[in-house]
Amino acid sequence: MLYQQIASNKRKTVVLLIVFFCLLAAIGAAVGYLVLGSYQFGLVLALIIGVIYAVSMIFQSTNVVMSMNNAREVTEDEAPNYFHIVEDMAMIAQIPMPRVFIVEDDSLNAFATGSKPENAAVAATTGLLAVMNREELEGVIGHEVSHIRNYDIRISTIAVALASAVTLISSIGSRMLFYGGGRRRDDDREDGGNILVLIFSILSLILAPLAASLVQLAISRQREYLADASSVELTRNPQGMISALEKLDRSEPMGHPVDDASAALYINDPTKKEGLKSLFYTHPPIADRIERLRHM
């Protein structure tokens, strides 16, 4: 059951990434058709913008991310138990030892960053280290190490970049169309087929950004499920992960502001969104995550 869930989550992520590229291609073609009169040019331009966005975000420094989240690097002497658990999980996962950081905050949370295992880092709050027992902490660190091993940070970064590219292209296309930069009417002897293409293009401009955001959220949620399952694969202790999630669910929001890009990295929502805002949350509900672990 465990390996079936891991394989299923990986397949779903691949499908969602394909859908993402289709969305990017569709919005590019729509803008190209409406503004430039050439859907081929718009399609190619959109893909180029998407790749540039993704590459620039992937190579963001680990130190920058840690600084944005008020994390400080610690040594084995400063936090031996925490350091050794990270070391153990990395060894079992067969990845290089990540750098180890602590965030001074009473809330219970942790995150990992790095575009590849060789430059990865793990951070945990002081609150989490104080409250979790060893089995629970192994579950949390196993979750973060799994993100590193599965290249989840890179995948999530690509998803954010593609969503940003779709929104940017849609915004530019809408403004150019609104302010008269659209296709010349003397070239538009519209027949039924052209009218359908025009309608599709306008709908793409309107709906693509929302669709891109929803796909990005779906990818992020699938990677969280995968990291939970992969953590159990490393620790062989589903109850430890379940107990950790139960404590995380009762945790207070973090004491310092966390931007949306960083919030997606954490094992638990650092802002504790409620109401309609929770619909656009990057993590699945903790109750659902616990339920999946219980059925392994």
From Swiss-Prot:
Keywords: Cell membrane, Hydrolase, Membrane, Metal-binding, Metalloprotease, Protease, Transmembrane, Transmembrane helix, Zinc
GO CC term, one of those recorded: plasma membrane
Domain of life: Bacteria
Membrane-related topology note: Multi-pass membrane protein
InterPro entries: HtpX_protease, Pept_M48_protease_HtpX, Peptidase_M48
Protein name: Protease HtpX homolog
Listed EC numbers: 3.4.24.-
Family note: Belongs to the peptidase M48B family.
Entry keyword annotation includes ATP-binding: no
Source organism per UniProt: Streptococcus agalactiae serotype V (strain ATCC BAA-611 / 2603 V/R)
Gene Ontology biological process terms, A to Z: proteolysis
Residues bound to Zn(2+): 143, 147, 224
Gene that encodes the chain: htpX
Transmembrane segments: 14-34, 39-59, 158-178, 195-215
Residues forming the catalytic site: 144
Subcellular localization: Cell membrane
UniProt key word Transport: no
Major location (coarse): membrane
